[in-house]
Amino acid sequence: MDYFPVIFSLLFVAFQGAPETAVLGAELSPRAEKEVQSPPPSTSWRPRRSKRCSCSSLMDKECVYFCHLDIIWVNTPERVVPYGLGSPSRSKRSLKDLLPTKTTDQGNRCQCAHQKDKKCWNFCQADKELRAQSTMQKGVKDFKKGKPCPKLGKKCIYQQLVEGRKLRRLEAISNSIKTSFRVAKLKAELYRDQKLIHNRAH
């Protein structure tokens, strides 16, 4: 099939319509010409999100939930997700914002926008304190386990007995849970087999 006549006719119609638009454009009033010539505003105003703080990691959903005040959060089956607001343009960050000035701030969970916001300050520092506290408790437990009892006397022996009982109890509970899961699995398989036999019989 030859496309040349189709293309030629389309070009002819397109170029024939161009002078008519130029004539119509000349008939416009001077006021309309001024409106056309005025440049559009360079940047449109976009709403800024009010942030209480900025998280060191966006994977920390609790921190993001705490810091971003104007996001509508929706509970989905898998996770909590932001809903409704598109992300506005981000302001350019300076070099001092990118590079941390103090080495002590690197371990913080987040950085507060206002230094006087005590609730934010406590939230951002809490994670670090809890981590330190849990490591201290773990260290104390390990230290107590490794310490010989004759120096501390009956109290140490009693503590070790209690810890041993707790461990045995936890092991017994986990074993009973495993056993109940095995029994439930066997019952499900038995029921499935009986159902297959019943279906084949009918």
From Swiss-Prot:
Residues 28-47 are annotated as: Disordered. GO terms for biological process: adenylate cyclase-inhibiting G protein-coupled receptor signaling pathway; artery smooth muscle contraction; axon extension; axon guidance; axonogenesis involved in innervation; blood vessel morphogenesis; body fluid secretion; branching involved in blood vessel morphogenesis. Residues 1-25 form the signal peptide. Keywords: Cleavage on pair of basic residues, Disulfide bond, Secreted, Signal, Vasoactive, Vasoconstrictor. Residues 110-124 are annotated as: Endothelin-like. Disulfide bonds join C53-C67, C55-C63. One of its GO terms (cellular component) is extracellular space. InterPro entries: Endothelin, Endothelin_toxin_CS, Endothln-like_toxin. It is found in: Secreted. Its main location: secreted. GO terms for molecular function: cytokine activity; endothelin A receptor binding; endothelin B receptor binding; hormone activity; receptor ligand activity; signaling receptor binding. Residues 26-50, 74-202 form a propeptide. The keyword Signal applies. The record marks W73, V74 as: Cleavage. Endothelins are endothelium-derived vasoconstrictor peptides. Probable ligand for G-protein coupled receptors EDNRA and EDNRB which activates PTK2B, BCAR1, BCAR3 and, GTPases RAP1 and RHOA cascade in glomerular mesangial cells. Also binds the DEAR/FBXW7-AS1 receptor. Promotes mesenteric arterial wall remodeling via activation of ROCK signaling and subsequent colocalization of NFATC3 with F-actin filaments. NFATC3 then translocates to the nucleus where it subsequently promotes the transcription of the smooth muscle hypertrophy and differentiation marker ACTA2. Belongs to the endothelin/sarafotoxin family. This is Endothelin-1.
